[in-house]
Curated annotation (Swiss-Prot):
Chain residues carrying a lipid of type S-diacylglycerol cysteine: 23
Job description of the protein: Probably part of an ABC transporter complex.
Organism annotation: Brachyspira hyodysenteriae (strain ATCC 49526 / WA1)
Name listed for the protein in its UniProt record: Putative ABC transporter periplasmic binding protein BHWA1_00430
Covalent lipid adducts (N-palmitoyl cysteine), residues: 23
Similarity remark: Belongs to the bacterial solute-binding protein SsuA/TauA family.
Biotechnology: Has shown promise in a 4-component vaccine with SecA (AC C0QZS7), BHWA1_00569 (AC C0QYX7) and FlaAL (AC C0QWY9).
Membrane association type: Lipid-anchor
Localisation: Cell membrane
Pfam families: NMT1_2
Key words of the record: Cell membrane, Lipoprotein, Membrane, Palmitate, Signal
This protein's GO CC annotations: plasma membrane
Amino acid sequence: MRKTVKIITSLVLIACLFLLASCANKGSSSSGDATTLKVAVMPFLNSVPIEYMINNKLDEKYGFKIETVYFPSGGPMNEALGAGLWEVGTLSAASVYSLANYNAHVVADIGHSEGGIEVLVNPDSDILTVKGVNKDFPEVYGDAATLKGKTIAVPTGTISHLNVIHWLRAINVDPNTVNIVHMEFPQAYQALKAKKIDAAALNPPTSFSAEADGMKIVSSLTTLNIPQYDSIIVSDEAFNNKKDTIVLYIKAFLEACDALQADPNMAAQELLNWYTKNGSTSTLEACQSEVQTRPFVTTEEIKNIKTGDSVRITADFFASQSLITEDKLTVVDQNVDTELLGKALN
């Protein structure tokens, strides 16, 4: 009897492995049709142009078809890239992992993502008594004396962590003289309000809520002049096998960005609709603030942006924090492409 059970169990396991392998093979291959793209979307602003493209049939206009694949955030989206489940997507800081670990390619920077990446303090913080100690950053607050012994909460290994490190560097503060603690954004903000910490590194929408509640910005990617972009990321397979379609996708994406950027009220409503569609709660006012501080890159603006610069800034930071190895920096550089954008603009 036991032998029979073992045989049956083995057969079941083999069948499961076969099914998994079949699924993996299906996922790892591109869409059979060279003009169809599996496009990753997330419940954030950077996917609004994709929704606009679909609703306004821009994919049909340019002769290709979008099939969306939904992900809740950049982490799962990257893991799915490794399994070949999508071909084109839009990512910010997480794109470093796409390029370094999955040999994906960044082909265009299409949205400003530095807006709202801020370090905030209570309005009575002594950090606010010192401003512009570094003349290159006149809107940045704090110095070695006011930061000594302070506790700063931030989700480590994120773009907000990069903001903290560059803030300390800008005002010549040794990171060893402050306490940097890992804390997710909502918890960090609650701790700041309760004055259990001295500063919180936040991102939208939490940073906007903090500002509305009277918290003060002491550092941000904007005041530190650190550009960050949401970028169009392409899987290695699609990059090598669907270049003509990717060029058409970039054209359509930029047309969507032009339309959204030309009408901020429409863009805010589109964002609110997107949030609602994906189960998030927001207000039109909050969406208006977000599209104002995180504008889309237009066809004209993109001509003056050096593709991949912000990816390299983030990659350098990730390497300094041992989130990627130093040898991956070369891989990131090699996977920055400007050829397809050039074709899309011509």
